[in-house]
Amino acid sequence: MEKSSIYGLTWTKLTEWLEAHGQKKFRATQVWDWLYRKRVKTFEEMSNVPKETIELLTANFVMNTLEEQVVQESTDGTTKYLFKLSDGNLIETVMMKQEYGLSVCVTTQVGCNIGCTFCASGLLKKSRDLTAGEIVEQIMNVQHYLDGRNLEERVSHVVVMGIGEPFDNYDNVMDFLRVINHDKGLAIGARHITVSTSGLAPRIIDFANEDFQVNLAISLHAPNNELRTSIMRINKTYSIEKLMEAIHYYVNKTNRRITFEYIMLKGVNDHKKEALELAALLGEHRHLAYVNLIPYNPVDEHIDYERSTKEDVLAFYDTLKKNGINCVIRREHGTDIDAACGQLRSKQIKRVGVRERMKQKQAALEE
């Protein structure tokens, strides 16, 4: 039987599991203290936990299902990690240094099926969801990386915007949030956590009904159905009308601000016409709408797309502001490394594929 990651258990699930296996309820407090406060890397280091409990945990769980493969460090402090999972799949995690602290962007799926035509993440289709433990471990690996360098820094913010669609892996993502937000866990404040979705309308409604104060971001990227469908396949299933119905429910239920992500593609969605359409689309909820204009990171496989000029981005920004929409032009991170989400993973898989083909050719020649 393959053991699962101990990091995948929420506080409630760990407590229930320990009690079901004859352990005292307070053992959960001890175990989580070792995992998230002292941040040990083996069960054996949990010195105040009885041997019987240690043996039970060791027999059923592991603490390291991720193996570090590549680390890229940018001159601006951004660090990109490529991890290998226990089944050999590769995922990316990114740490960004912000004025307000350290932010980590986590991956939730191996590959992506959303079908955004400009994105590196979808170059390889989804093969499976990540477990809650595999998502939490991304944060823990980054934190261990910081601890190992005696930097005395901690991950203070989390964005669920890496490879995959978080709401397509809903239950595992919710457990991940419960772990990192819990005051006995990583204790990352809910207002410091943002979950991004490409627009799974039913799950936006589910998310509104959760007991979280976590921020929500919508990957919108176009203000009308024709344009959005041409660059985001998901719009065929959940049109802008369906998406806005879900957003209306979310806003009325939570009264929380929503960030709308809008990637700027030269000659595609960056005209004044689209800016005016976007302002009109968000007009009803402009007091809780916040638009994040994102400079495009070119992807080798998507040669049809280029980043908008600075002049066009500024003009788009000005049009939104003049029409009462709060917005910002996102600061770029890691431009001197594989900046686009999924790009490092895609390149690594290609390299491995090339090496394997060369090995096969060499073997054939030697036969």
UniProtKB/Swiss-Prot annotation:
List of residues binding [4Fe-4S] cluster: 112, 116, 119
GO cellular component terms, semicolon-separated: cytoplasm
Protein name: Probable dual-specificity RNA methyltransferase RlmN
Cofactor note: Binds 1 [4Fe-4S] cluster. The cluster is coordinated with 3 cysteines and an exchangeable S-adenosyl-L-methionine.
Predominant cellular place of this UniProt entry's protein: cytoplasm
Regions crossing the membrane: none
HAMAP family according to UniProt: RNA_methyltr_RlmN
This protein's record includes keyword Plastid: no
Enzyme Commission number(s) from the entry: 2.1.1.192
CDD domains: Radical_SAM
Active site: 92 (proton acceptor), 341 (s-methylcysteine intermediate)
One of the record's GO molecular function terms: tRNA (adenine(37)-C2)-methyltransferase activity
Needed cofactors: [4Fe-4S] cluster
Source species of the chain: Listeria welshimeri serovar 6b (strain ATCC 35897 / DSM 20650 / CCUG 15529 / CIP 8149 / NCTC 11857 / SLCC 5334 / V8)
Reactions catalysed, as given in the entry: adenosine(2503) in 23S rRNA + 2 reduced [2Fe-2S]-[ferredoxin] + 2 S-adenosyl-L-methionine = 2-methyladenosine(2503) in 23S rRNA + 5'-deoxyadenosine + L-methionine + 2 oxidized [2Fe-2S]-[ferredoxin] + S-adenosyl-L-homocysteine; adenosine(37) in tRNA + 2 reduced [2Fe-2S]-[ferredoxin] + 2 S-adenosyl-L-methionine = 2-methyladenosine(37) in tRNA + 5'-deoxyadenosine + L-methionine + 2 oxidized [2Fe-2S]-[ferredoxin] + S-adenosyl-L-homocysteine
Group of enzyme by EC: transferase
NCBIfam families: rRNA_mod_RlmN
Record key words, sorted: 4Fe-4S, Cytoplasm, Disulfide bond, Iron, Iron-sulfur, Metal-binding, Methyltransferase, rRNA processing, S-adenosyl-L-methionine, Transferase, tRNA processing
